[in-house]
Amino acid sequence: MSGWRRLLEEESEHQWLSFTVFSIIVIIGAVLIDWSSDLSGVHDGSTLDVDGIVMDSAGDSILYQSDDGIRITHDDNENTAQYATCLEEYSGMTLACLGNEGMLGFIGDGSDDCDDTWCQFSIGENLTATQVSGNGLAILMVVQDGTSDALAAIWFGESNPEPMVSDHEGNLHLDVMLPTEDGWLVGGSWQAPANWLGSNPTSPPMYELVIHVTWDGVNAPAIEIVHMGNEGSIHGLFTTDDGYIATGTSDTISIIDGEISSLGISSYAAIGDNNGDVWLFGGIGSNTVAIISGAEISIERLPEPLKILPSYVTCDEDGMIAIHGTDNTDNPSAMSIDSNARQSFTSLRGILDLSFILVSILIFSIMGWNIYEAIRKGEVF
């Protein structure tokens, strides 16, 4: 104890020890914190264990592209679904766009026949659904209409449905749907007609599109254009505390009380986590991930450049984000991110930040004790 006291007394006279140690701690801490600023919880692989490229998932079902074609799994059952395009959770069961004209697939309804086996119900004649979304008892579907898409609506449970199909101008390609309080937001792209404003007649440009759809149950679904952006396509729609977020390959927009704001972020895929944040992923070689949290946008650095061209992203009930796509050799690839690790106290960044604070408090306490002792003894310091 006498040695420690002599060291403190010597330090109180010269103040060299605290300043030296504190300077070293600041330098080392800055280096370590910068090193630890990479996004935490990133690792290879996915919670969706299939041998192929995941196209969609819902509940216990996974739709994926394998070497043998498109397949769909549900628990331990696996089936060929060569023309399937979508999966959607609805009222405790899973709906599937299986590519069969006039029919939608479903599983997990609790009945003896269809709880573990895919069944189908009618959606009307001459319609093939590629996307589906339920809102209450109303079912909205994206259906094929020649080379374009249209929207059709039916009541769930109708024995002989007579779907109402929307009438619209232009060539629509619709990929995502999100139920709202009074209808749906639908996103995708609008394709310009041939020779539109001097464009290439063989490959007219496609522009990001968000539309609002309402249905009164009697007439065809009503369409209102919410946003038409630059060349690209909307691939994600998400609910936030204040409104909605639409993510696209050209831009990301927020929709709050009917007001549209550009966020200036492009992405290949996006997902909303369990904390209400929206994660946006770029293409192969991207070094960062953009995360929208309310009105704030943070850019997180990945531990290494992205090795995947993302095509599908999901987030499970534990907050684990799985990114699926292809690598630079066009082989299936996946990676996962723990969305809760970014702000976790036990993350490397959190531990280093806490350690830096504790060491700083210790050093300042020693300096304060020395100042107190010097004042008590009437010494000049």
Describe these PLM feature segments.
Residues 2-23, 29-381:
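Residue-level hotspots at or immediately adjacent to binding/recognition sites across diverse folds
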